[in-house]
Amino acid sequence: MPPMGPQKKKADSWAGGSISMPLREDLLTPIAGENPSGIDLRHDTKLLIHDKIKEARRQDDDLAQGDWQSERKTANFPLVVKIAQDALATVSKDLQVAAWLTEGLLQTEGFSGLRVGIGLCQSLLTDFWDTVYPESE
């Protein structure tokens, strides 16, 4: 199926998927400014989007803790989805962020979320090939 561009496809229907949590319609809209893919988040020291997503994804193992039991940290995948969508729409077309969004969609929506996330990654590669992050070497 040939790429249709961001204006011709509904954000939550990439690759034929349908999810209960709506994706933002502007995920494939170019970022305002000189580069349509925005900034490289790997070198960002202000927004720290990668760090925020990593923290939201972090969870403790299910290992016995003996006498020093503490509350186990669980991943917050709805927060991962929100941060990733905000970043992709307004800051950077970043494949690592798109992959984390896909993981979040899989965890919150199941296989239909995975299908939508993979479709988003494919669309980012198609629509932003020359400028998507990380840049090809």
Name these PLM-found stretches:
Residues 1-136:
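N-terminal domain-start signal
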